[in-house]
Amino acid sequence: MGCFNSKEAGAGRPKTTTQQQQQATPEPTVTTAEVRADEKISMDQDISQGNVEDFYVVGKELGRGAFSVVREGTRKTTSDKVALKYIEKKFVKKKHIEQLRREIDIMKKVKHENVLSLKEIFESDSHLTLVMELVTGGELFYKIVERGSFTEKGARNVVRQVCAGVEYLHSQGIAHRDLKPENLLCNGEGEDMTIKIADFGLSKIFGTGEALETSCGTPDYVAPEVLTGGSYDNAVDMWSIGVITYILLCGFPPFYASSQNLLFEKILTADYDFPEPEWTHVSEHAKAFIRNLIVKDPDQRHTAKQCLDDLWLSGSDQSIGSAADLHSHFAEKMKKYNDQRRGGQSSNN
């Protein structure tokens, strides 16, 4: 996370992004400098007084990460359900404190129906606990795997909500910088499920006209201007939305290669197509929507507002393709790659 290397990525087609992503995204460098027991990660004015257990009944474990565990919680006074993310401070390296603080600052700032909300924070000598909105439907990635297909109508519903959330984030001066199905959480089932944008670990608050320069994100979804090492802006999020839309509609990514270097070459030239028969039943409106996002020049990319006004998202059902099973024959391959990433991850992790 935060940089790219030259490890080999998976070969072949069609393929989910998971195998490439796991091989291409290095783990953060571990240092010996840890957070002291008396060192605060969050700002004092942000911390709720008392212990989290004084206010919440702690329930079952929902998932586990590298240095965190997520449990279901119930507010004692209201019976409201929440997700309690316990971060064990001794595993948080000093070099990552600012990143964690930035993530908390952003989550405190945002309030939108398509963005995961942070309710309050508790901090003890051993743990930082984030009280978050509970999302029970899991990652969008798993929906793709489990269902094996999205109708164009279902894909459109997902993309519309992602664009609405991103438009809000951009209006608040926030670039997410790591949009992917794993960071899109689902509430409910079927074509009317609600989408929540999550994981702001790589997000950045920027001023009007300010350019960003840090190379970060997940290789399969990263925009060309990030790979070149130059400056970029929030248009990188729109490229990622284009890639996500492409995957939803056919079951495999627009860019695939036998190595990460070859993958980057394809991304840098925006070298992709809409192969048959996978795209036979997908409407031209959907393809045009993608072409306006997966475009090399960021200045030519549609903004989130333009996407919401696009005929594919704003039009009637007549503007979309048939409700045919778009990619059920890719389900088996996706399940295989998904097995590699099952490690107790949580929908709120």
From Swiss-Prot:
Residues 16-33 have a biased composition (Low complexity). This is Probable myosin light chain kinase DDB_G0275057. It catalyses: L-seryl-[myosin light chain] + ATP = O-phospho-L-seryl-[myosin light chain] + ADP + H(+); L-threonyl-[myosin light chain] + ATP = O-phospho-L-threonyl-[myosin light chain] + ADP + H(+). ATP binds at L62, G63, R64, G65, A66, F67, S68, V69, V70, K85. Residues 1-33 are annotated as: Disordered. Belongs to the protein kinase superfamily. CAMK Ser/Thr protein kinase family. CaMK subfamily. Its EC number is 2.7.11.18. Residues 56-313 form the Protein kinase domain.
